[in-house]
Amino acid sequence: FFLAGALLPGWRPLAGLLGLAAVIDYVAITFGGVSAFCVSPAYVALAPAYGALYAAGHWYARGHRAELSTLPRFAAAALAGTAVCELVSSGAFYAFSGRFADPTLAEFGTRLARYFPLALEGMALYLGAAAIAAAAFMAIGPRRATHAHG
């Protein structure tokens, strides 16, 4: 959702992406044998959680240039989007899923400390792969243009 926010124009694509995510979850659970543990009354909180990632990507895109000087903005946007997404999605799941007998703020803090690094790791892998792909396309792009007109 972060990359979609950075690459797609406006906010309209977000609704389609949220629908696609729900369909993917449904298919994975119904036909792929994936556990339905996370599907609960808190599932609806994924919309604002993913929306936060989309918004962070959208904010980054407004100041993007293909220069290393935009790397701090990129990192700040990715970190902020991931943090808000994790707080909203995990917080809602912890508070509203019905999976925890006696939810407390202290226990949520312990769980957040355990799972937030995994969210950062996942985001870093996705964004690292996207950065490598973008660098490869940028390196190949000028060569193709030269050969096409040469």
Predicted regions and their residues:
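Alpha-helical membrane segments and adjacent membrane-interface helices in multi-pass membrane proteins
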Residues: 1-54
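Membrane-embedded alpha-helical hairpins and interfacial helices in multi-pass inner-membrane proteins
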Residues: 63-150
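Structural signal for the C-terminal ends of transmembrane alpha-helices
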Residues: 4-11, 52-65, 132-141
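Non-catalytic terminal and connector segments of soluble metabolic enzymes
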Residues: 31-34, 56-60, 72-73
